[in-house]
Amino acid sequence: MNWKSLIFPVASVLLFSACGGEEPQAPAEFRFSNDRTAFENEANSTFSFDVRIDEAKTTEVQVQYATADGTALAGEDYIAASGSVVFAPGETKKTIDVSIIVDEWLEPDEYFIVSLSAPEGGYLRDNIQEAVGTIRNDDTSIQISDEGYTTPNNYPGMSLVWGDEFEVAGAPDPAKWTYDLGNGSWGWGNNELQNYTSSPENVTVQDGRLYIFARNEGGYTSARVKTQGIFDFQYGRVDIRAILPIGQGIWPALWMLGSDITTVGWPACGEIDIMELVGHQPRLVHGTFHWGPNNDERQYNGVIAPALEFPETFADEFHVFSLEWQEDEIKLLLDDQHYHTITPANMNGYEYPFNDAFFFIMNVAIGGNWPGDPDDTTPFPGFMAVDYIRVFQ
């Protein structure tokens, strides 16, 4: 045997000895295996998220994690968490626990995010580096501030002739309010998406306020209350103090229609929009008048009310939406700031319908030609809270 025949076996033995006889450990693939969705209650006060690696390892591997706000806020809706997830040899699954703050306050469904980062001994699986925790809300108590603008309960030379302070809990006072129900004709003429109900899920009096809730629970529902056939009036001052819902596709309104609508139709009866807001413009409200002999010749005249520097939106605190109405003139006011007037001179040659009796309507529409459809950013349930409505003459 010559020396050349020994060189390759010897080299193989040396290489095997240097590697310890084992294959190198493959990098671990870190990933989440679940999102988490649950109602906010004591039974679901902890959200657990599973983190997995593709296969057990012979040495320790780890990855960092941290929570981040979505629409849910750390310290208000959940407890912020961060740290390391360590996989001991042989382990393939670990759990991250995030504590949920349970309360009784009605609020929209909200979410937060848990993210993985800085893997040691492995890498992050594409598109599975984050998990979402969605906090569903089934509470009924409402938490809003009484902060904001207010108006007096009397004016010199005028008397309170009608109003509602919403002091009796439950359904709206049937001696003052009735309902429009259903989905109307062509979505109430605007391709709106909601079905109006008289359910306490959509309209209720609580803590001295009337609440109208816009919901999305297997279909859009809301409420539309009115005084038609119960109370109408001609001339005077109206004050309505309210907090408004906001969000894409949300459309709250405080408005009036001519009492002769059943005989002359719309828009010949006249329409006075004391306040309308389209939810994607949360710092702007509109005041508008509609008239004309028929739908083909309908006319309107409207303006945007002055935007306030504080609060940021009309959902943050109460504002008072008012009109001052006399023969041949109506003025619209926001927090006692006069911003628009209509007179017969604005009718474009058509009949002025605003010297006749009108009735009130208050509603929250969902979707429609003006605001557009809701999307994933729209907070549900949304609500309008009315503190009082008063008529002085």
Give the predicted meaning of each segment.
Residues 21-144, 152-153:
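Short boundary segments that mark the start of a structured unit
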Residues 1-8:
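Bacterial N-terminal signal peptides that target proteins for export
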